[in-house]
Amino acid sequence: MTTSAPPSPGPRQLHLFISGLVQGVSFRANAQRMAHTLQLTGWVRNLPDGRVELLAQGEEKNLKSLLAWAHHGPAQSRVDHVETHWVEHHAPVEGFHIQ
């Protein structure tokens, strides 16, 4: 690594609402595994309307990988739509949890 390289962008936050067949198909457990693999923090939970809500924090490239995964999810799921919100500033979250 050279000292003249620009600094890497800081942590960002990604907030997703995923709709389709995403509950009862291990979506949250697989999202947690993917987040751990990508060294992201945050949480994932089922919503009463049948969607899954996911909040992740970390490096942008890793968040983009999680977003790409969220568009198809685990094999048993069917993702119809992913509502995506990027946030620059956030309060840090420890670990990645299923709520």
Q: What would you call each of these model-derived segments?
A:
Residues 1-99:
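Intrinsically disordered, low-complexity, mixed-charge
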